[in-house]
Amino acid sequence: METGAKALRLLVLFIASSCVPFAAFAQTTPSGPAIDAEVNNIMTETHSNGMAVAVVDHGKVGYVHAYGIRDAKGDPLNTDTIMYGASLTKMVFAYTVMQLVDQGRLNLDTPLRDDLDNPLPSYGADPVFPDKYGPYKDLADDPRWEKITPRMCLTHSTGFSNFWFVEPDMKLHIHFEPGTRFSYSGEGLILLQFVIEHGRKAQGLGLDVGDLTRANFDRLGMTRTSLVWHDALETNVDDGWNDQGQPQAHEKRKKVRVAGSMNTTISDLPKFVAALVRGDGLSAASRAEITKRQLHITSAHQFPFLQPELPVSEQRKDLYAGLGVVVFDGPQGHGFYKGGHDGGTANTVVCIEAGQRCAVILSNDVRSEAGFADLVKFILGDTGVPYDWEYGDHAGKS
């Protein structure tokens, strides 16, 4: 009888333990010296000249450190060095958009045509920066633009290529029915920026996105972060290195482009990431929308864009677009991430909802990308972040 009771107790304990949520199996963040050693190893392996790393734990910024050099002269990279944020800008923009949703100025599912006073194709180029937005006149004969919503812009499902200027004819095209599938598109986010900046003032639009983001940066104490270059950023600026180890001058972007004009530092950016993972500055509903499974991603890789869909049996079941981020489910539960890349830049932010834990990595050497998967795993443990989809065999290549 006692033996049977003991077996029953063990069975109950086993069932209970198997139902414990992911958060209960908390990962331990490595010490600062351990992170330093791992970063130095990865920099050696990838031939990287510079990296900067920060850790967020329980929604608070923890360890922050910079490694290597910031320019070809050999000046040290430090935590206040201005670095190019690249496509991490998209994550910041999505957060800003959801604040406008909270304020009732935008609705995620209202077609953008309803936010404008005139048809989109009737708008000409910006008088100051002619290439700030897309050539919307190119859509005059394609009524599908009228279906595009803010949600589609933030989930990369507008049907646009990444940018109009990569099209063979240098024109803006819609390649598939808006909202039906994912294909990475900075152009879609630029369209949403246009509507926010030129939309109906009667509903609270006609706003400067640079001002909106700056208000958040000021609130969070991000004193050296901006979506547009200004004089205060002129000191302690990095250069980049391409995959051949050749230095690349830091581009000083004079116009706000939400697809990728942000400059930041490793001291600043984790403050935003911590606020995002906590939901600071957003309603609970808007915070949930950002990391919700919005749209299933069915391609083999993120790039090249406009890839065909994989057969259903080969699609990753947990891979979805969030709003401005990609979401996934792994050994530690639900997570989200965003990357940033250009010829001499490699960035990544990975967050796990359980424990509000994030790794923030900025690099001024594109070759660092090849070590991101190992470094994120070292800091956060096994997350399941889909770097195979993100990079394919292009990690570390310009």
Regions found by a protein language model. Name each.
Residues 1-7:
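N-terminal secretory signal peptides that target proteins for export/translocation
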Residues 10-23:
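Bacterial N-terminal signal peptides
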Residues 28-84, 105-107, 128-129, 166-176, ...:
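Short, conserved catalytic-motif segment at the N-terminal edge
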Residues 30, 34-41, 92-96, 107, ...:
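Extracytoplasmic/secreted proteins, especially bacterial periplasmic and envelope-associated proteins
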Residues 44-52, 73-126, 133-151, 176-188, ...:
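Short active-site loop at a secondary-structure junction
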Residues 123-336, 341:
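Short, surface-exposed loop or secondary-structure junction motifs
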Residues 295-304, 308-310, 363-398:
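Short, gly/Ser/Thr-rich active-site loops of penicillin-recognizing serine hydrolases
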Residues 335-339, 346-365:
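Short, well-ordered beta-strand elements
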